[in-house]
Each structure stands twice: as structure tokens, then as C-alpha cells.
């Protein structure tokens, strides 16, 4: 039972526990969407 529930929790929790990662992902997506040249968006 515990093993079956853990994987889903592991995938869902890190996003809430690590706001820095979510922020980086958001910033990366925003940069890529704003800048047509991905390599230079850095």
C-alpha cells in the first residue's frame, strides 16, 4: 500500500516543496516563449 502511494506523492511533492525548481522551470519557459532564439535566451 505504502509503496503504491509513494511514487505519486514523490512526483507531486517536490514541485510544492522546491519552489526554486518550479520558479526556474517557469522562468525557462517564459524566456523560451519570449525569445525566438532559444540558444541566446540563456
From Swiss-Prot:
GO terms for cellular component: extracellular region. Disulfide bonds join 35-41. Residues 1 form the signal peptide. InterPro entries: Contryphan_CS. Residues 2-31 form a propeptide. The modification Cysteine amide is found at residue 41. Expressed by the venom duct. Keywords: Amidation, D-amino acid, Disulfide bond, Hydroxylation, Ion channel impairing toxin, Neurotoxin, Secreted, Signal, Toxin. It comes from the Eukaryota. The modification 4-hydroxyproline is found at residue 36. Its main location: secreted. GO terms for molecular function: ion channel regulator activity; toxin activity. The keyword Transmembrane does not apply. Belongs to the O2 superfamily. Contryphan family. Exists in two forms, due to cis-trans isomerization at 3-Cys-hydroxyPro-4. The cis conformation is the major form. Its target is unknown, but this toxin may modulate voltage-activated calcium channels (Cav) or calcium-dependent potassium channels (KCa). The cysteine framework is C-C. This is Contryphan-Mo.
